[in-house]
Amino acid sequence: MRISKAKLSNKLSSLPLSCLALGLALSFGTAKAGDFPTAKVNTTGLAVTDTTVTVGILHSATGTMAISETGSIQAEKLAIAQINAVGGVLGRKIEVIQEDGASDWPTFAEKSKKLLENDKVAAVMDCWTSASRKAVLPVFEKDNGLLFYPTFYEGLEQSKNVFYTGQEATQQILAGLDWITKEKKAKTFYLIGSDYIWPRTSMKIARKHIEEHLKGKVVGEEYVALGDTQFGSVINKIKLKKPDIIYAAVVGGSNVAWFKQLNAAGLNAKKQTMLTISVTEDEVLGIGGENLEGFYSAMKYFQSLKNPNNDAFVPEFKKAYGGNAVIGDVTQAAYLGPWLWKAGVERAGSFDVDKVVAALPGYELTTAPEGYVKVDPNHHLLSKLRIGKWRKDGQADVVYESELIAPDPFPKGYQ
C-alpha cells in the first residue's frame, strides 16, 4: 500500500519540529533537489524522481507480533513526516509503501522481495523478531537493499546491507545480568523465552555468562511456542525451583498471558525478582502495569527517561497518536531509522545503497530521544543500557544507567 505525504495524515504533517528534527535540519541545511540531479544521485534504478524518493515500511500490523510492532510503524511514520517538514532528503519528499509481515516469517521475505525488486525502494524500515530478520536478510543481500532493523537482538550477525538501531547481546544481555546479579546478590536463575532464534540464542549467551563469569547456576530453562498462552506448567516448575531471578525473553501476545498468570499464581515482585529483556511500554499496554509492577526490564530507552531530547519527543508522539500512546525501546529505535538513513544519504550526496552504506559509519547523533549515539563501523550503535523498574501505571523508573557501551556483535567466548 502506497502512502503519500498527505496520507501520512494531516495531523502528522502539521506537527511542530522536534528537537531531533531541528537539530538535523540545522546540521544538513535545506537541500534543494536542483542541486542534486536525479541522474547523479540515483545511478542504480531506485524509486527516486526529481521531487520524491520512496522507502518501505515492513512490520507486523496483524498477528501475535502486532502488539510489539505497531509502535515501530508509528515512530517511522512520525520521523518521515518530520523529515518531509524540513525539506525531505536531498530536496525530495519521502513517500512510503507499507506492507504487513503478518507475524509470519515467509511473508516478511516475500514482502521484502516485492519492495526491493518491484517497488525499487531506496531503504526499508523492517522487522521486529530475529526470525523475520533472518528470513529477509538473504533478500536484502541478493538485491543489495538497505535495511534499518530496530530491535534489540542476540548479535552474532553483521551485514553490509543492515544497520542495527537496537542493542546487541553484549550491550543488553551481559550488562543487564551483571547489574541484577550484583544488585540482588543472585546465585540461581530460571530462563524462559519464546521458541525461536532470538530467545534461544540470547539464553545460550545468558547461560554462559551466568555460569562462567558470574559463577551462578541455571536451575531451569524453558521455551514456549510463539503465541502460546499456557504457562501453568512453567510456573509450577518455577515455584518448585525457587530461583533468585527469573530471566525472561517471552515475546508478542504470549507476554500478556505470562505476566497475568504469574500474578494470579502469586509470583509478583514481592515474592520473586524478574529481569526481562523483551518487555517495553508497548507490551505493558496489553499486559497491564498491575501485572508486572516491581519487575525489571533491561533496555536502552524508557519513555520516562529525562533529557531535553526525550522531553520534546514524548509530547510530539502523543500529539500524533493520542494521549494514551506509549513509547517503548524498539519504538524509539525505529524512530532513529529514517533519520539515520537521511544522514547517510546526505553525507553521501546519493541514494545509491553502496554510497550510503559507506557514508553512515562514524555518524554521531546527539539529538536522539535516548541521548547520544554513534554509528559504529560494524553497523551497530554505541549506546547505554538502562534498567527500568515497572510501576503500576505502566511506566518505569530508571534505576540504573551504564556508560556508553561499544557494540560487539561477535564477543569472544560467546560464539
Give the positions of each predicted feature.
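Periplasmic-binding protein-like
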Residues: L115-C127, F148-P150, Y190-G193, K242-G252, ...
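Short, low-complexity disordered leader/linker segments with a strong preference
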Residues: M1-T54, Q415
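Extracellular/periplasmic periplasmic-binding protein-like sensory domains
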Residues: Q261-Y335, E346-F351, Y400-Q415
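Extracellular/periplasmic bilobed ligand-binding domains
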Residues: M203-A298
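Solvent-exposed, acidic/polar segments of extracytosolic/periplasmic ligand-binding ectodomains
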Residues: G34-N42, L46, V53, P361-Q415
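Hydrophobic alpha-helical segments within soluble ligand-binding/sensing domains
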Residues: K40, F108, T165-F189, R200-T201, ...
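An alpha-beta-alpha
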Residues: A61, V162-L226, I245, G322, ...
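Beta-alpha junction/loop-to-helix N-cap segments that form part of ligand/metal-binding clefts
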Residues: F36-T43, T52-T54, I67-Q74, Q82-L156, ...
